[in-house]
Design a protein with these regions (language model features):
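Aromatic- and glycine-enriched beta-alpha-beta binding-site module
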Residues: 26, 34-101
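N-terminal ordered "arm"
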Residues: 1-43
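Short, basic/low-complexity N-terminal boundary segments at the transition from targeting/disordered tails
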Residues: 2, 43-53, 124-130
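Detector for Asparagine
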Residues: 5-8, 30-31, 47, 63, ...
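Conserved aromatic-histidine-acidic binding/catalytic patches
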Residues: 11, 52, 119, 123
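A contiguous, surface-oriented mixed alpha/beta subdomain in the mid-to-C-terminal portion of proteins
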Residues: 71-179
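Short beta-strand-initiation
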Residues: 18-20, 59, 66, 143
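Short linear motifs in intrinsically disordered
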Residues: 11-16, 60-62, 136-140
């Protein structure tokens, strides 16, 4: 997680997360859907909200609470969810740390807690997908590029980011907004 500079958010987390970090929309490269994301750093491989192994932001998004586990669509049935794990990440180990399963084969307390969090997150995921689709259908997303000024004078740019067009948002009727 200390190298994760972008994390997916649920719409229910936006108000709390926006107090600490910038939020943008990006397109999922696999399915083209809009994804609500928070940036923990504008540098890949960096997370400014982890200091000495501890999360320091005011709000801890669900995906940080459950990392390296995550909610995903079932490969066997796209109408169902399942739990995935990032086995390639350095925090995942088969030799050290908390076990996923007890010696009797039952889920560990840690896995049970993560499973409960992820299961309760299914409704948040469904609401977020519906919200993102609605925002897109209303034409409220506009592209934004960010130029970063480094001390050494270099100015890398971030593209592929989208934000809510506040001018368009102000012109919407309440009926359109609350459909």
């Amino acid at each position: 997680a200390h190298q994760q500079n972008i994390m997916n958010l649920r719409v229910s987390e936006v108000s709390q997360t926006a107090c600490s970090m910038p939020i943008f929309y990006v397109r999922d490269g696999n399915n083209g859907q809009w994804v609500l994301t928070a940036f923990t750093s504008f540098e890949q491989g960096s997370n400014l909200f982890i200091k000495q192994g501890k999360w320091t932001a005011l709000h801890t998004p669900t995906n940080m609470q459950t990392f390296p586990f995550f909610l995903m669509m079932s490969p066997d049935d796209p109408q169902r969810y399942t739990i995935g794990i990032d086995e390639q990440h350095e925090v995942f180990s088969t030799t050290t740390g908390q076990p996923i399963f007890e010696t009797n084969g039952k889920a560990s307390l840690h896995l049970s807690r993560v499973k409960t969090l992820l299961e309760s997150d299914i409704n948040n995921d469904i609401q977020t997908q519906a919200f993102n689709q609605h925002i897109s259908q209303l034409g409220l997303l506009r592209p934004i590029s960010i130029l970063i000024q480094h001390k050494d004078g270099s100015t890398p740019s971030l593209s592929g980011l989208f934000t809510v067009d506040e001018d368009k948002l102000q012109t919407l009727s309440q009926e359109a907004l609350f459909e």
